Amino acid sequence: MPEEAETFAFQAEIAQLMSLIINTFYSNKEIFLRELISNASDALDKIRYESLTDPSKLDSGKELYIKLIPNKTAGTLTIIDTGIGMTKSDLVNNLGTIAKSGTKAFMEALQAGADISMIGQFGVGFYSAYLVADKVTVTSKNNDDEQYVWESSAGGSFTVRADNSEPLGRGTKIVLYIKEDQTDYLEESKIKEIVNKHSQFIGYPIKLLVEKEREKEVSDDEADDEKKEGDEKKEMETDEPKIEDVGEDEDADKKDKDAKKKKTIKEKYTEDEELNKTKPIWTRNPDDISQEEYGEFYKSLTNDWEDHLAVKHFSVEGQLEFRALLFIPRRTPFDLFENQKKRNNIKLYVRRVFIMDNCEDLIPEYLNFMKGVVD
């Protein structure tokens, strides 16, 4: 029997923000997945840090990962992480009743014409889920509390109740009920494209449940089982008795056995596919990285078939901290002197999450043939 649900009103600024997200047209809706994956990664960081001083924190689940499950039949996209999870008070406070300091600032920025993709910088990235979903449920289990489920269709209120259905062990499961006009976000290819673009260098495995097909060899009678069942059902429905010729039974059976043939059928199955196998080598010490590793990373970053000509890998510490990994390609780009071309090819990341690849202030225009990342 489902537990009694408590209803809470969204804090005024949050309700206003959600209304803005739902009722304004944004073309860049795909950032919702980047934000939810970033939140999942933060939750995984937290449990990992806690486990460094108290390894028993991982007794509720040692494997740290993020899993994406699209379900076209139900029209849902599920994001699961085995991170720190949320207590009941976390769900109530963090997802609705206490506005983060960035809520108002973000709304002001939006109204001033800022891009929706900046939402994560203001600490309210979770609400971007409502760009593509008309209902969201968040089931969460923290080591210090029972499992609870948060639910809202963004109508000014949300509910929280205890959940005894499917134990998570530890972590969070977010189910997005995708809007009818946004179902392309349930396509495997679309999800892979977004993860590859925005979350390729997240420090935990991102697994996608994919549907595949394989060939299976079966004997004719296995393949015909369903047909037999249908015939038997038909006979039961008619009044005519079944006439058997018992005299030739043994001979017929022997012939059947000899004549049994194998046939190949196609069967569908699902399995997890890891989407972020390329690791962010710029976070490592340059002394530990071989030229081959730089070469492989350069090719995966740029889709160039040739090795790079030169590489510069450095970090800056102080008031502003960043790491940079810059490559000079072996060949001059064919459009080097075109005015209309993209101003630079440096990708900007913040904590391994892709932000943009057109930040003109990163390098001067005359160096726009360089490729690389700044994090």
Curated annotation (Swiss-Prot):
Which superkingdom heads the taxonomic lineage of this protein's source? Eukaryota
Q: Name one GO cellular component term.
A: endoplasmic reticulum chaperone complex
GO MF, one example: ATP binding
The family database entries (InterPro entries) matched by this protein are listed as: HATPase_C_sf (IPR036890), Heat_shock_protein_90_CS (IPR019805), Hsp90_fam (IPR001404), Hsp90_N (IPR020575), Ribosomal_Su5_D2-typ_SF (IPR020568)
Gene Ontology BP term (one): cold acclimation
The annotated region (Disordered) lies at: 213-263
* Signal peptide residues on this chain, from the entry's feature table: none
Q: Where does this polypeptide localize?
A: Cytoplasm
What the protein does comes down to: Molecular chaperone that promotes the maturation, structural maintenance and proper regulation of specific target proteins involved for instance in cell cycle control and signal transduction. Undergoes a functional cycle that is linked to its ATPase activity. This cycle probably induces conformational changes in the client proteins, thereby causing their activation. Interacts dynamically with various co-chaperones that modulate its substrate recognition, ATPase cycle and chaperone function. Required for piRNA biogenesis by facilitating loading of piRNAs into PIWI proteins.
Q: What is this protein called?
A: Heat shock protein 83
| Gene that this sequence comes from | Hsp83
